[in-house]
Amino acid sequence: MALKRSYYASKDDYSTKRILEIIERPLKKLTIEDTSEYDDSDIEMPTCKRVAYYKNEYTIVVEDLDAELEEDDSINKPTEEADEAPRTQLSVISPLEKKLKRDFLFLLLNSNRQPGKSSGKSSIPSPDDFKLSVKYSSSSEDLGAVTIESHLNVSSDASIKYKSSGTSQSDLLMEIG
């Protein structure tokens, strides 16, 4: 059995390690210039909207960086402009809600089945069957609130509406009619 080499050798017999050593040498000699000689007026910031997006295993967080900068500026300015409602700067959407909706619909479909019908996997709704709309308001009392609505027709006479608010509570209601 052949031993594995830790570095890949190219056709020219340069290993990855050797190439990295060649690149690192000039990088170590680089120094950071003194930025005090530059004036702030020379630097132009782009006008595009900057949004930070990151996620962990439970939540997806979308943060509006421009709104955060505007909020910092409004705190430092006099209270004349403080009456304006700040922009929403944080929206949190939990991917666990998809699983909760799917589990609820699975229970609902199993409870509505007639005893003579066979239970197959084709009747279980997939998360793609949901229409998902996210709404948020910019008023100060609803800062960061996210509303998620899902509609799915289970049968001809039943439909489910699921509403969740990102701030405090979740409501689950079923309409049969």
Curated annotation (Swiss-Prot):
A GO CC term attached to the entry: nuclear envelope
Keywords: Nucleus
Compartments (UniProt record): Nucleus
Domain of life: Eukaryota
Bias type Basic and acidic residues, positions: 74-86
Major localisation: nucleus
Region annotation (Disordered) ranges: 71-90
Function: Involved in meiotic chromosome segregation.
Protein name in UniProt: Meiotic chromosome segregation protein C17A2.07c
Organism of this sequence: Schizosaccharomyces pombe (strain 972 / ATCC 24843)
